[in-house]
Amino acid sequence: MSLLNDILEFNKTFTEQREYEKYQTSKFPDKKMAILSCMDTRLVELLPHAMNLRNGDVKIIKSAGALVTHPFGSIMRSILVAVYELNADEVCVIGHHDCGMSKISSKSMLEKIKARGIPEERIETIKYSGVDFDQWFKSFDSVEASVKDSVDVIKHHPLFPENVPVHGLVIDPKTGKLDLIVNGYNN
């Protein structure tokens, strides 16, 4: 049986037994916060528990490395929607130690892309269109500096309100310990 079939089979039972009822909440975050975190599997349950968050408390936006790499990309758009449409009054950027994004390179990514059957012509077309793969697959050396950079992009976005604090934290994916990098109340 495929993973998709397993999911659909589980979902059928989940909905028939009305398991969803214990998760019902509104679309507005009770704690009025949006969190940008990494998509690392170790954080799926650890991060909310380490922050004492429950379903409905916050908006969680996930990206590789918790990076805001483009001020007008989908991550920044999601943060702006959380603030203006969903009543988030604070934003947290949460990176983590041992992040895979600190280890990737555009060269390695392109090799893996080609190994999966994507022809060189497509890659060249993308390059010709102006995409800089080194920038697009940007990694980092320091998670703390990376978090500060993402906080800076958010805070200085021309559409981001000045009165909304943007915090930066780093979580240990083994213990859940949070280290404060940027206190948005002080900026």
Swiss-Prot record:
Its EC number is 4.2.1.1. It catalyses: hydrogencarbonate + H(+) = CO2 + H2O. CDD domains: beta_CA_cladeD. SMART domains: Pro_CA. Its cofactor is Zn(2+). Disulfide bonds: none annotated. InterPro entries: Carbonic_anhydrase, Carbonic_anhydrase_sf. It is an enzyme of class 4 (lyase). Signal peptide: none annotated. GO terms for molecular function: carbonate dehydratase activity; zinc ion binding. Zn(2+) binds at C38, D40, H96, C99. Binds 1 zinc ion per subunit. Keywords: Lyase, Metal-binding, Zinc. Belongs to the beta-class carbonic anhydrase family. Reversible hydration of carbon dioxide. This is Putative carbonic anhydrase YtiB. It comes from Bacillus subtilis (strain 168).
